[in-house]
Curated annotation (Swiss-Prot):
InterPro entries: P-loop_NTPase, Small_GTP-bd, Small_GTPase_ARF, Small_GTPase_ARF/SAR. GTP binds at residues 23-30, 66-70, 125-128, 159. A lipid is attached at G2 (N-myristoyl glycine). This is ADP-ribosylation factor-like protein 5A.
Length: 179
């Protein structure tokens, strides 16, 4: 009886899941947010502060916060961490010079108490650009295999075409079913 009640409750419970989208400036965070919400590319300018959109996938609601990635804004990322269930880190696969900065920011975030239960989705963006870093290279540079206390997934994508974005959302949906 308890299992039946739980399944019925899930059908009608429209809980919202908080997601933050972070990454260095010019990684493609805002483009990804608006691909999710409008399924189209919008002209963007550097995000000062944040953008927020509600995305509904199969009756599951995600409240997605796109947070500015400029160096001066990164110290304020932690103000968005409370109640976050998923962190999406967008990596510019063409930016070899700053991959170490991405790694530093990633591990700072993962050490924060408010994110201890958050799932981690890494979008390796701009995979359409010649000579970009592969998913394997990014995974190695970010030392993802050393992450033991968070569920994580890395997904190749191209924000401009939307390629790979649905697979990332599917991974997030699969993590919700496990809980």
């Amino acid at each position: 009886m308890g299992i039946l009640f739980t399944r019925i409750w899930r059908l009608f419970n429209h809980q919202e899941h908080k997601v933050i989208i972070v990454g260095l400036d010019n990684a493609g965070k805002t483009t990804i947010l608006y691909q999710f919400s409008m399924n189209e590319v919008v002209h963007t300018s550097p995000t000062i502060g944040s953008n927020v959109e509600e995305i509904v996938v199969n009756n599951t609601r995600f409240l997605m916060w796109d947070i500015g990635g400029q160096e001066s804004l990164r110290p304020s990322w932690n103000t968005y961490y409370t109640n976050t269930e998923f962190v999406i880190v967008v990596v510019d696969s063409t930016d070899r010079e700053r991959i170490s900065v991405t790694r530093e920011e990633l591990y700072k975030m993962l050490a924060h108490e408010d994110l201890r239960k958050a799932g981690l989705l890494i979008f390796a963006n701009k995979q359409d650009v010649k000579e970009c870093m592969t998913v394997a290279e990014i995974s190695q540079f970010l030392k993802l295999t050393s992450i033991k206390d968070h569920q994580w997934h890395i997904q190749a994508c191209c924000a401009l075409t939307g390629e790979g974005l649905c697979q990332g959302l599917e991974w997030m949906m699969s993590r919700l079913k496990i809980r």
